[in-house]
Amino acid sequence: MYIENINGPEDVKKLSEDQLNVLAEEIRDSLLKKLSKHGGHFGPNFGMVEATIAMHYVFESPKDKIVYDVSHQSYPHKMLTGRKDAFLYEEHYDDVSGYSNPRESEHDHFTIGHTSTSISLALGLAKARDLKEENGNVIDRKSTRLNSSHRCIS
């Protein structure tokens, strides 16, 4: 399994396109197994697997900041940022929260649950980056049940 060898976004970048497709299947299989036994958010996560893999393939998290508007869609992100065991192994299912959580990982920047906060949070991160004269992108991960969009605030 490719997911077992993913300890951070840098490992995603090492995979070929075919391997990335298999990784997406493995993520969905792991989510289905965990969420069937433990509960959690199915739809928001299943619909964002490829987009999450692509973001971690293209951007440099945590230097590039990814902000989730609906952070209960962040399970694939958690799996790709060092928290895969909480989705692969039943004894670790309670190791992560159902939302983004900066106490869990440097790849999470806010504790957020539901919608309508990401634009202002992303703009705040971009302004702070500019004031500190730092580099990096800020990606606003906006999503609803029917559509999704991603904004890169540079």
Per-range role (PLM):
Residues 12, 148-154:
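RNase H-like, Mg2+-dependent phosphodiesterase core
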Residues 23-24, 29, 41-143, 151:
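Cofactor-binding active-site loop characterized by glycine-rich and histidine/acidic residues
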Residues 16, 143-145:
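Alpha-helical hinge/cap motifs
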Residues 1-34:
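Cofactor-/ligand-binding subdomain signature composed of acidic, glycine-rich
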